[in-house]
Curated annotation (Swiss-Prot):
Prevents establishment of cellular antiviral state by blocking virus-induced phosphorylation and activation of interferon regulatory factors 3/IRF3 and 7/IRF7, transcription factors critical for the induction of interferons alpha and beta. This blockage is produced through the inhibition of host TBK1, by binding host TBK1 adapter proteins TBKBP1 and AZI2, thereby producing a strong inhibition of the phosphorylation and activation of IRF3 and IRF7. Also acts as an inhibitor of the cellular response to type I IFN by interacting with host STAT2. The keyword Phosphoprotein does not apply. Interacts with host TANK, TBKBP1 and AZI2; these interactions prevent interferon production. Interacts with host STAT2. Keywords: Early protein. InterPro entries: Poxvirus_Bcl-2-like, Poxvirus_sf. The keyword Lipid metabolism does not apply. This is IFN signaling evasion protein OPG029. Belongs to the orthopoxvirus OPG029 family. Induction: Expressed in the early phase of the viral replicative cycle.
Length: 151
């Protein structure tokens, strides 16, 4: 995991959004005490949670509690649930929703690691290449905006 958690910059040409997301989900799955400090890349990833709250009409945390990737049946139900709301959430809100799901279920035992892995696999089904491109550009812009504010 340590490739992006402390990173302050992100390149559209050479960095992989999938790698960032995988590292970020692994970082989120840790307890707060175990999480290493983060740089601007993960700080920008955290802003997708705001999108989830903004784009979803109801209580995003209630929806997040219904997402489960621990069994095949619950994985399929979760996939259907998210896919049916994807137009309302947008790709940014969906990224934020899945981040909230992992954050709610964080911990240091093996079931939390399996849960995070299940969410990463769920993302592979939910996000297509266009979605990944949108996330990549959005992440880049959010980091740039943060840099502009910090100057």
């Amino acid at each position: 995991m340590n490739a992006y958690n402390k990173a302050d910059s992100f390149s559209l040409e050479s960095d992989s959004i999938k790698d960032v997301i995988h590292d970020y989900i692994c970082w989120l799955s840790m307890t707060d005490e175990m999480r290493p400090s983060i740089g601007n890349v993960f700080k920008a990833m955290e802003t997708f949670k705001i999108d989830a709250v903004r784009y979803y009409d109801g209580n995003i945390y209630d929806l997040a509690k219904d997402i489960n990737a621990m069994s095949f049946d619950s994985f399929i139900r979760s996939l259907q649930n998210i896919s049916s709301k994807k137009d309302k959430l947008t790709v940014y809100g969906t990224m934020g929703l899945l981040s909230i799901v992992v954050d709610i279920n964080k911990g240091c035992d093996i079931s939390n690691i399996k849960f995070a892995a299940g969410i990463i696999i769920l993302m592979e089904y939910i996000f297509d290449d266009t979605d990944m491109s949108h996330l990549k550009v959005a992440l880049y812009r959010r980091i740039q905006r943060r840099d502009d504010v910090d100057r």
